[in-house]
Each structure stands twice: as structure tokens, then as C-alpha cells.
């Protein structure tokens, strides 16, 4: 194996509730289920039984206006309640008896907050028109390569590099390419390395800090989510058409080439990661 030393972990992110805004961290435990407390909760649509996701903005147009944060630091043996800030500024807590009522009222649709995924969970994913294809909504499974009962789209860890962000900015300078558009768990500062750096990592492993080891399994396919407005970031379909579409690569779990940004990873060895930890990649 060829081994190269990268610069460091740039940032670490956790999203307590699936598809809501999350938390930037200085450090986190990495467990078999990924960043401790990541996507531990999700909303379930009571009418369809599907997991609520910003991937279908037709049904959930303002979901990125909701923000989730733990009331206390999570522990490996128990997770504390989560505070959810609604677009109105009102806050509800996951352990309140009327939390489902508050969320349903805010969303104008009956939902329930869940901490364990239902059997065979799925969500609706909207694909905007591109390359002559009509707009469509597909039904997608959840947690394909992640532990049972979790709410990950596919894998427990999502990694992005600064090299990729820089490449996207060069392709579409008018677009605001920021890390939060892509919702990674770990951002790796690749220094002077240029381009879609992590494409070459698929099939290899990366070692972070003293003990964490991750196997890179697949590129991360992209849909509508990175183009959506969130906070001061505007809605911009050019993010997809003029940026992401330039990186169509083979995705093993899909069996075809798809527009992708970042990579998915499986946890081999758990531990703790911190910002500025060294990162080594073995390909």
C-alpha cells in the first residue's frame, strides 16, 4: 500500500436529527455507528411511514430551517435529550410529552420524532431535471451499510476534503460552496493537494489521530440537497449543474456512475478524533 500523510482534520460535524442543521465540534468519539450521537433521531411522516428528509423539498420545503443540538454532551451508554429550534425561534425538546404536536404544527403535517428506525426504512428523494431527464421523486432505502436501526442514508461516516471544495469553487465561482452544503462528518484539510482528492481513497483506509481507522467504501452520490437554501446560503441549482456534475464517478453500491462529492466510510477501529489530528491515507 502507498501511504501519504495529509495535513489534519479540519472540522468535525454532528447532526442529532436527520436532515436538520447540526453542530460543529472540536472533538468527538467515533463508535461503530459513526460520530457519537450523529443522526440518532429522525422524524417519521405519520401518513406514509417514511423518514422525513430534506431530499424531498416538495414535501418538506423548510426543513433546513430547523436546527438540532444536544442538551448535554452525549455519552456512549446514553444520549441526552435534543433541543430542536423551529423556524419561528421556538424551541422544543425531544423528551417533552408534546414534542410531536409541536413539530407537527410547525410542519403543517403529522409527524413523530423517533430514536430507532422502523423496519425497512425509506425516504423520498427528489431529482431535479438534468441531462434531459424529467424531474422525478424516487423511493430510497435508509442505512444500507450502517448499523440496523440507524437513520444514515447509506454509511455511518461521510468524509469531505478541502481539495474538493476548492475544485468546486474553481468550476463555478459564482456559487457559494461551503462545507455545510454537503453535511459531512469529517472535513480533511488536504493542503496543497488539488481536485476531487477523495475519489482515489475508495477501497483504502484512513487513520486519524491515535486510534481511529476508517475504511473508505464508496463515493457519496448527490441529489438536490446541496443546492437548497440554508441560513445565509441561497438556493442555487448551479451548485449541482455547474459544479457537482463535473465529478461523475462509479459508485459501487449503486453499480453505476453518479455525480458525487465526498466519500462514505465504515468504522474499523473506534476512538476519539479532534480538530488538527493527523490523517494518513492508505490506498
Which stretches of residues belong to each language-model region?
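Metal-cofactor-dependent catalytic cores
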Residues: 1-283
